[in-house]
């Protein structure tokens, strides 16, 4: 852009830097550019401002009033603020709109006015110069100074070529001149694609079949290579054969659109080709080259590819194509005659280091657009995090998108007015309404008082808005690595941002949180807690899942419930768990339902039950319930998931499992646990029983699963049988759910120790675990309590106490019955139920 600046415009930039140094500012903002324009003194901008009574001293004093002096003089290079960069971009647009091939002082001033939000615009308004009036003055003076400023242009504009009107009427209608866009500075810089650009130049310089086609994955920079070629042509960095060439991109959609009758499309395409032949200096760029095949071929008409083939073969038409690997294979390779006319140029995905260099090259454009400052750490984070966590897209596109959205996010946050300004607006509106009511009531004394209040509020609001605009908006906001991580977290649901103090505390207390739902099972709770902490601290193996466990042990001891509790801890919802019942996959052919049916089979387009869910929620807990019931082929498919953290679905897409926790539950080796010690509870030799069961479970797992499957599992956890104390604690949890339902009816529920003990005795089975406990509570407590509520024996405002008759606490309790007594809740203790017996709104029970 700076090569288009006139000598006076360049002098303005130098003077702006000097003004920044004088004010001890370590940046060049719009205010310094304005000072430079006035200080220059001879250009159209200076004359325009002088005619409006704007002096250098007046502007300086206003700048010092709004911003003030800096602490110390800056050393070395002083950078432009994003807003100042935006002004310089706008000056180029103003020059192009006026048909000038140079950027003079007047264009910089017009850019300042068009930007309209910086300190410079505030200063002009404060000094009584309306922005529209300043613009009119510049345009008026331009008529007298245009010839003089053009003489200053020097090397700017490359001899005025960009100012000449285009003669390519048809091409301008159906395409876009990339060389003109490059000359006007509208194209982003191209970083590190020298080899690809050189290869394209070599193919274009051939005598025949001089048509390169850029092949690469979406988002790797195929179009950027062509834009780089256009910039090389503009800068003269091409061989003699390509000098003075014009690079046009053809829009096939525009060619086809509106062609209602047979022959319309062919006629348009022939006109384009005729114009290219007449000009002789046109290189055609067709993005999405595969759209040539079949384009316009309705009702028997020949398609665009067939029309272009003869000219491509004879070298009469030079074309650059771009398409993806899949589309090239699907469309171009099938048409051998078309394929041989194009020479493939592979465009690979850049490395993370190369992507960082690309982002640094684009930084100025995004800073100017979003009016923020983007740190080096943000660019490194964008490249590395995008490469690690966004697996279905390619660099540098996904990293650029992260930077772009983070900048947009920061700008939106800063441009939102503070809440106190909205409060002022509400108070002013209220004062006006009250004033009008007072006038209608002819209470003029009150109306005068309200008028004064309104004026005071308006003045206070104006002062607060001035502070906001001159303070917050002129402090350049920074986009750093933390904001990049937050944007990525919003995209993928993977929490990669830094741990807050609250989350750190919560993670350290994770076992305690899980034990609110899980009774006992210390080993299992510790294992999953460590896996989650490892992931959030960033220390897990980046190529494997966050954790993989086999939960083995008797039925009904909390294996599935722990998985649900973990999902609830991470996402706040039990439904966040991806639960796969492996009993549905006992046949070999049912494996395709998990990963997606192969082509040609029913359900191919739908995707797999597992792969689709994980693809949409990559940070999740996946539970494979009762894994031993699945077919052996499924275990083979899961080996790659456990080792490499990825799996290819039926449609060839790679699904990332690196941020999932994989849990397999199994009941293997526990079928003979039916002879407990004592009355259904583990006592005395319980630890020996557990070790015996653990050994048997491990032996059964080794028999059932292949060694390569078990070897990839992080930990095999054998759950304990439940003890008497744990069953009684489960009673408390389950009763809390019933009490929570009663609380909505203004009732409370209290169970005596005897009632809890009898429920535990009747509800526990050594084979089925604690699952029967839920049915026992439903039968003995909920059913009887519902009848008493319907018979109005108990009601709102009462505490229902459940006790036991005919049981001494030791025997089998076959004749024991539960009794329900309703008493009025004391007024002083409205939360008696909560204090007395685990009443209100506890978590879901863990009797599984």
UniProtKB/Swiss-Prot annotation:
Residues 821-848 are annotated as: Disordered. GO terms for cellular component: cytoplasm. ATP binds at residues 216-223, 553-560. Residues 5-70 are annotated as: Repeat 1. GO terms for biological process: cellular response to heat. Induction: Expression requires transcriptional regulator ClgR. One of its GO terms (molecular function) is ATP binding. Residues 2-144 form the Clp R domain. It comes from the Bacteria. Residues 80-144 are annotated as: Repeat 2. Residues 171-418 are annotated as: I. Pfam families: AAA, AAA_2, AAA_lid_9, Clp_N, ClpB_D2-small. Gene3D superfamilies: 1.10.8.60, Clp, N-terminal domain, P-loop containing nucleotide triphosphate hydrolases, UVR domain. Keywords: ATP-binding, Chaperone, Nucleotide-binding, Repeat. Residues 479-670 are annotated as: II. Residues 425-460 form the UVR domain. SMART domains: AAA, ClpB_D2-small. Belongs to the ClpA/ClpB family. ClpC subfamily. ATP-dependent specificity component of the Clp protease. It directs the protease to specific substrates. Can perform chaperone functions in the absence of ClpP. This is ATP-dependent Clp protease ATP-binding subunit ClpC1.
């Amino acid at each position: 852009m700076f090569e288009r600046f006139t000598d006076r415009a360049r002098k303005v930039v130098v003077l702006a830097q000097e003004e920044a140094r004088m004010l001890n500012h370590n940046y060049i903002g719009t205010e310094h550019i304005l000072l430079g324009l006035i200080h220059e003194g001879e250009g159209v901008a200076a004359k325009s401002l002088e005619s409006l009574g704007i002096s250098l001293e007046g502007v300086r004093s206003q700048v010092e009033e709004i911003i003030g002096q800096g602490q110390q003089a800056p050393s070395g290079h002083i950078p432009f603020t994003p807003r100042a960069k935006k002004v310089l971009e706008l000056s180029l647009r103003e020059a192009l709109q006026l048909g000038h091939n140079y950027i003079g002082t007047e264009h910089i001033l017009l850019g300042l006015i068009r930007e309209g939000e910086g300190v410079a615009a505030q200063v002009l308004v404060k000094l009584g110069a309306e922005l529209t009036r300043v613009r009119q003055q510049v345009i008026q003076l331009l008529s007298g100074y245009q010839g003089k400023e053009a003489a200053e242009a020097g090397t700017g504009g490359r001899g005025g070529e960009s100012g000449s009107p285009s003669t390519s009427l048809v091409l301008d209608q159906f395409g876009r001149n990339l060389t003109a866009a490059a000359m006007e500075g509208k194209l982003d810089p191209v970083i590190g694609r020298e080899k690809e650009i050189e290869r394209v130049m070599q193919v274009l310089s051939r005598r025949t079949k001089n048509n390169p086609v850029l092949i690469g994955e979406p988002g790797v920079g195929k179009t950027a290579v062509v834009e780089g070629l256009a910039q090389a042509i503009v800068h003269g960095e091409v061989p003699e054969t390509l000098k003075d060439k014009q690079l046009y991109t053809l829009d096939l959609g525009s060619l086809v659109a509106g062609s209602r009758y047979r022959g319309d499309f062919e006629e348009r395409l022939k006109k384009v080709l005729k114009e290219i032949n007449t000009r002789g200096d046109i290189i055609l760029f067709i993005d999405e080259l595969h759209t040539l095949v079949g384009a316009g071929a309705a009702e028997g008409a020949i398609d665009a590819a067939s029309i272009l083939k003869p000219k491509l073969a004879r070298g009469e038409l030079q074309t650059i194509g771009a398409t993806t690997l899949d589309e090239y294979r699907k469309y171009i390779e099938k048409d051998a005659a078309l394929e041989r006319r194009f020479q493939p140029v592979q465009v690979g995905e850049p490395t993370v280091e190369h992507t960082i260099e690309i982002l640094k090259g684009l930084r100025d454009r995004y800073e100017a657009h979003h009016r923020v400052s983007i740190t080096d750490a943000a660019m490194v984070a964008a490249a590395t995090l995008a490469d690690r966590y966004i697996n279905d897209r390619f660099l540098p596109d996904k990293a650029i998108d992260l930077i772009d959205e983070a900048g947009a996010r920061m700008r939106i946050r800063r441009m939102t007015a503070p809440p106190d300004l909205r409060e002022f607006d509400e108070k002013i509106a209220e004062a006006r309404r009250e004033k009008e009511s007072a006038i209608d009531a002819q209470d003029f004394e009150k109306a005068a008082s309200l008028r004064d209040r309104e004026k005071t509020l308006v003045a206070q609001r104006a002062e607060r808005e001035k502070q906001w605009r001159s303070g917050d908006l002129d402090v350049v906001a920074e986009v750093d690595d933390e904001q990049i991580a937050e944007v990525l977290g919003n995209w993928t649901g993977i929490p990669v941002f830094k741990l807050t103090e609250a989350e750190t505390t919560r993670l350290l207390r994770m076992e305690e949180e899980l034990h609110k739902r899980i009774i006992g099972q210390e080993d299992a709770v510790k294992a999953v807690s460590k896996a989650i902490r490892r992931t959030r601290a960033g220390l897990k193996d980046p190529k494997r899942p966050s954790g993989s466990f086999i939960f083995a042990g008797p039925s009904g001891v909390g294996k599935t419930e722990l998985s649900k509790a973990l999902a609830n801890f991470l996402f706040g919802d039990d439904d966040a768990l991806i639960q796969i019942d492996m009993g549905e996959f006992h046949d070999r052919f049912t494996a395709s339902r998990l990963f997606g049916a192969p082509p040609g089979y029913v359900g191919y387009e739908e995707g797999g039950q597992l792969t689709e869910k994980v693809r949409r929620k990559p940070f999740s807990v996946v539970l494979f319930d009762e894994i031993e019931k699945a077919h052996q082929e499924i275990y083979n498919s899961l080996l790659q998931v456990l080792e490499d953290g990825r799996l290819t679905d039926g449609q060839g897409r790679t699904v990332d499992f690196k941020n999932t926790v994989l849990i397999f539950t199994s009941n293997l080796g526990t079928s003979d646990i039916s002879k407990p010690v004592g009355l259904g509870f583990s006592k005395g030799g319980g630890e020996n029983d557990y070790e015996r069961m653990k050994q048997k479970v491990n032996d059964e797992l080794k028999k059932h699963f292949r060694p390569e499957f078990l070897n990839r599992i992080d930990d095999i956890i054998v759950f304990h049988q439940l003890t008497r104390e744990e069953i009684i604690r489960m009673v408390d949890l389950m009763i809390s759910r019933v009490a929570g339902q009663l609380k909505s009816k203004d009732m409370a529920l209290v169970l005596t120790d005897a009632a809890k003990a009898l429920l535990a005795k009747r509800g526990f089975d050594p084979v089925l675990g604690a699952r029967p406990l839920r049915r026992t509570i439903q039968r003995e407590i909920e059913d009887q309590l519902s009848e008493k509520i319907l018979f109005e024996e108990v009601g709102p405002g009462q505490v229902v106490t459940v006790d036991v008759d005919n049981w001494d606490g030791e025997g089998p309790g076959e004749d024991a019955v539960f009794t329900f007594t309703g008493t009025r809740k004391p007024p002083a203790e409205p939360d008696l139920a909560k204090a007395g017996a685990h009443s209100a709104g506890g978590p879901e029970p863990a009797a599984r």
